[in-house]
């Protein structure tokens, strides 16, 4: 369970491979992910925004730390084996915080971003994409689209 960041590193490594082999160019990739795939997109855009022209995140799991801490949510307890228990284990808390997209937004340039939420999604609370978008508006240093 403390290997989740391998997913993000693998995605970034794959993107760099495509650039190196000239299938695309640095800043020319458009990423897409929803739900847990949105977690992936949020984490990689924070780690390597220069690789992307844009990104679509549909109902993304973007505040994974806060959701993990709330065991009253229907999916939180079921996901402890995959993501760890930030509420009951300090090491898991630190690990979750180290990649939670919302908690790792920085003052820097971000690519064009389209974030979609859904009031009736059973897996991801609607406020995760909205909080992520609001914080990005405060922190991003570029003029790229943020919708």
Q: Where do the language-model regions lie?
A:
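Active-site-proximal cap/loop segments of hydrolase catalytic domains
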Residues: 1-147
């Amino acid at each position: 369970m403390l290997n989740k960041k391998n997913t993000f590193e693998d995605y970034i490594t794959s993107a760099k491979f495509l650039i190196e082999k000239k299938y695309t160019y640095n800043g020319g990739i458009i990423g897409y992910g929803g739900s847990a795939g949105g977690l992936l997109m949020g984490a990689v855009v924070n780690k390597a925004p220069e690789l992307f022209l844009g990104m679509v995140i549909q109902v993304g799991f973007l505040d994974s730390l806060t959701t993990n801490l709330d065991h009253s949510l229907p999916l939180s307890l079921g996901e402890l084996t995959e993501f760890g228990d930030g509420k009951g284990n300090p090491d898991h808390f630190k690990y979750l915080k180290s990649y939670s997209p919302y908690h790792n937004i920085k003052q820097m340039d971000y690519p064009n971003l389209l974030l979609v939420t859904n009031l009736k999604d059973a897996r991801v609370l609607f406020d995760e994409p909205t909080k992520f978008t609001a914080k990005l508006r405060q922190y991003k240093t570029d003029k790229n689209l943020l919708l």
